[in-house]
A protein has these predicted regions:
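C-terminal catalytic-base region of ester-bond hydrolases, centering on the histidine
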Residues: 32, 98-106, 134-137, 348-445
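N-terminal topogenic membrane-targeting module
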Residues: 158-183, 192-194, 201-204, 208-211, ...
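Short aromatic-enriched loop/helix-cap "lid" or pocket-rim segments at secondary-structure transitions
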Residues: 199-200, 288-294, 365-370
């Protein structure tokens, strides 16, 4: 924390403690209200709100709430100790006066706490449902509530600090347009998801790339269908982007099954001359061994029921001919082995720059459902994995980058595309993609 920040925090802490313990002064001289009311207003409305480094109102409000809670906790502890000591002096002889002291302090800190907690609960992107729920459950449990509050304060202060630093980085390099590649970027989603304006599959990544000069487009293909069907869709989408932008080619960044779909589009659908580069992210190029087994042991009627339900739902969301079972079978190790024989030489001979990225989780606790369960299944079959795909299946192209865990959390199949917009310790996913696209730019692509 910088010196200015420490000074402001100490200033707010003093104001908060003064107000919380000011009942005797107000009782003796009502004119102290002229100090109390402005101090109360400053604490509840202006702490942390005015910051030029905060890129949005949401983060300014989050910072306000986090600082308010950070001030509340030590100040409230001082107030509790003060009133316990006071109780020994005033009870039983002057218990009514002590009660008024305590009620005044309780009312003051009640407002401060709820102001802070409501602000962070409504605006923090990093608290998550689990941490919010634990906070609500433990709120009335002594000692546990203090630990929960400390955790909430740490999470939200870390969030606003991180976002402020990112804003500073982006402002400093805004003129460089480090992601302004020669050819536009095409982001291709994986299986069981669709491109949507409401929910962005790629989280905060597209906005970060665009802010740094990139032109970003989406695949807009089926959520689940065969590699061949999706490949045809993507080939048409590539032609559409080329016509729309006037660019000669596109740079493709594809996640999961999207990597297989793009390889097929390049090799089989006549768009090899329209693709400058292909970057696959956690794609199962050698398939998933556990998928072969699951499709064998799960009864056909169960598979058909799941597929029918999924396909029906996806038709309502815009897919014309979803095919869940074929999509799943195209992720098996046996199918991908056959596919590789067809596609590898075809993609390589067109002179397209090819690279791949993979990541692995540290443990089953590294991600939520269903990746936490699949991590254990995949580990039994194939060893280290990202919750869905084994590390043995990622590598493709001239360059391979394996993102290994620097902490026990690791990086999951969803973390690597920022799907849930949760920051991963020691891995800035947005900056990773900025560097990825910057490298394409430096290669003249």
């Amino acid at each position: 924390m910088k010196k200015t920040g420490i000074f402001l925090y100490a200033f707010y802490l003093i104001i908060c403690t003064f107000c919380g313990l000011s009942f005797p002064l107000l009782r003796e001289n009502i004119n102290y209200l002229y100090l109390f009311i402005p101090a109360f207003i400053v604490l509840n409305l202006f702490v942390g709100v005015f910051s030029a480094k905060m890129p949005s109102l949401r983060l300014r409000v989050c910072r306000h709430g986090a600082l308010l809670l950070a001030v509340f906790l030590p100040s409230a502890c001082v107030a509790v100790i003060h009133h316990v000591v006071l109780a020994f002096k005033m009870i039983p002889g002057d218990w009514k006066n002590w009660l008024w002291h305590a009620l005044f302090a309780f009312g003051f800190y009640f407002v401060i706490f709820w102001n802070g907690i409501i602000c962070v609960y409504l605006t923090s992107a990093q608290l998550g449902i689990r941490q919010r729920a634990i906070g609500l459950i433990c709120g009335l449990i002594p000692v546990a509530n203090v630990f929960c509050l400390v955790s909430i304060i740490k999470t939200t202060l870390r969030e606003v600090k991180f976002e402020a630093e990112k804003e500073e980085i982006n402002r400093a390099r805004s003129d460089e347009r480090v992601c302004a590649t020669k050819y536009p970027i095409l982001l291709v989603h994986g299986v069981c998801f669709r491109d949507s304006k409401i929910f962005n599959y790629w989280g905060r990544i597209p906005r970060e790339l665009e802010r740094n000069g990139a032109r970003v487009f989406y695949g807009n293909h089926h959520s689940a269908s065969s590699v061949a069907f999706c490949g045809e869709e993507l080939a048409e989408r590539i032609r559409e982007i080329v016509r729309e932008t006037g660019a000669e080619k596109v740079n493709i960044i594809a996640h999961s099954k999207g990597g297989l779909d793009c390889r097929y589009a390049i090799a089989k659908c006549g768009v090899s001359d329209l693709v400058a580069s292909l970057t696959t992210i956690n794609s199962p190029h050698r398939g998933c061994q556990y998928a072969d087994t699951l499709l064998t042991v799960i009864p056909n009627q169960v598979q058909d029921k799941v597929a029918t339900t999924y396909n029906k739902a996806m038709r309502h969301l815009g897919d014309i001919s979803p095919d869940f079972l074929t999509a799943m079978s195209n992720l098996t190790a046996s199918y991908c082995a056959e596919l590789a024989l067809e596609l590898d030489d075809a993609v390589e001979k067109h002179g397209i720059y090819r690279q791949s990225v993979g990541s692995i989780m540290g443990s089953a606790k590294s991600a939520g459902f269903p990746l936490n369960y699949f991590y254990l299944i995949v580990k039994d079959f194939d060893g280290p994995n990202d919750g869905l795909v084994s590390d043995k299946s990622f590598e493709f192209g001239e360059k391979f980058t394996l993102l290994t865990p620097k902490t026990r959390r690791g990086i999951s199949h969803m973390d690597v595309i920022d799907m849930v917009k949760m920051d991963v310790p020691d891995f800035d996913v947005r900056e990773f993609y900025v560097d990825l696209v910057r490298d394409l730019r430096e290669r003249g692509l």
